[in-house]
């Protein structure tokens, strides 16, 4: 997870066109800065002050409630978005875009949610 500030979307402290579902953003949490995967549907993001995200972790367990991420998504190492730990976060805490899932990978969000809810 890079965060070097050298990427075109890494404008710390400014929102670049706002987050969209399937994008990975740096989030400024109380205790540390960490990447998160935006889960909330696009139609709701602009009207909500908080959105649902899946935290990104380097601990990859290869379980159905994870979405695999890596360099192709703007991250510096192999990671996973953990849908077992979905959480709301204030939109203003998302500071810079890291990357995004490919159009063909967006279904992975739905798959992980179905696994989370066991449906």
Residue ranges, per PLM feature:
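C-terminal terminal-subdomain/extension
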Residues: 2-13, 17, 73-119
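Compact nucleic-acid interaction/catalytic patches
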Residues: 32-71
């Amino acid at each position: 997870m890079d965060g070097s500030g050298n990427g075109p979307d890494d404008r710390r402290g400014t929102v670049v066109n706002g987050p969209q579902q399937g994008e990975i953003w740096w989030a400024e949490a109380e205790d540390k800065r960490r990447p998160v995967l935006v889960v909330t549907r696009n139609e709701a993001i602009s009207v909500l002050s908080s959105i649902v995200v899946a935290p990104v972790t380097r601990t990859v367990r290869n379980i159905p409630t994870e979405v695999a991420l890596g360099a192709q998504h703007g991250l510096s190492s192999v990671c996973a978005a953990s849908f077992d730990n979905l959480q709301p976060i204030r939109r203003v805490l998302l500071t810079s875009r890291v990357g995004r899932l490919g159009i063909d990978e967006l279904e992975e969000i739905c798959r992980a949610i179905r696994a989370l809810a066991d449906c």
